[in-house]
Amino acid sequence: MKKSCQMVERALVEGLLKGEFKPGCPLSSERELAARFGVSRATVREALQKLQSAGWISVQERHTTVVNDFWSHGDLEILSSITRNSEEFPPDLAAHLLELRLQFAPDYARRAIENNAAGVAAILSKAEKLRNCASALVKFDWELHLAMAVMSGNRVYPLVLNSFSGVYSKLRSSLFTKEKHRLQLRSYYREMLAAASAGNALLAENITRTAMLFRLNDFKNCFGPLQGELPAPA
């Protein structure tokens, strides 16, 4: 039953992302969904409960299930649900997350240098010994950015980053498999180490902004014109 429930949940999330089920409209009944997926109504009910907990849908009067306006009123649970239920994280949404990181990564990098330049330098000094493979770089890059977020003194930054950990893991094949990506990443570490060693917080901010912009633009170039751009909230 567990696998069947996951199958139903995944299919419904895919349909919601594609706009098959419109916000404000009723979802198909349990009976109809059970027939569609070839499972029991109990299995459908369990999947719907998970979607409701994540914020995709709401059960209203007379047990009518209505699709929420999740892009306008959802929260990070929606991202977690998408991560769990997607083989490949939607490229358009991934680009939006990279745009978000472009906004806050330079700030936590600057704050981290201001608060603990020696601590940041100590982490960055380990970069030269990293194996030149995607898995090692992904792990180190994640730990570096999380550490800088913590050292920034802003308690929200680590919470936001940790909410994206599953997404980041899924994106690693796009961000670190090519040699040019790894070379750019190592260049970023060397420049950041120099900035941290000098205690130059503003330089670290600018270096990080340039690096995040490079990753964003390169990601968009890899996918070309992104398909299925998310609609702007009404």
Where are these regions (language model features)?
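Short linear motifs at protein or domain termini
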Residues: 1-103, 226
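Solvent-exposed, non-membrane alpha-helical residues enriched in polar/charged side chains
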Residues: 13, 17-18, 149, 193, ...
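Short, hydrophobic secondary-structure boundary micro-motifs
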Residues: 23-25, 121, 158-161, 204-205
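Short loop-to-helix capping motifs
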Residues: 29-30, 153-155, 199-200
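A broad structural signal for alpha-helix termini and local helix breaks/kinks
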Residues: 37, 152-153, 223
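All-alpha effector-binding/dimerization core of bacterial HTH-type transcriptional repressors
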Residues: 71-147, 187-207
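Hydrophobic, amphipathic alpha-helical faces that serve as interaction scaffolds
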Residues: 84, 88, 100-116, 142-181, ...
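C-terminal all-alpha effector/ligand-binding and dimerization domain
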Residues: 128-129, 162-234
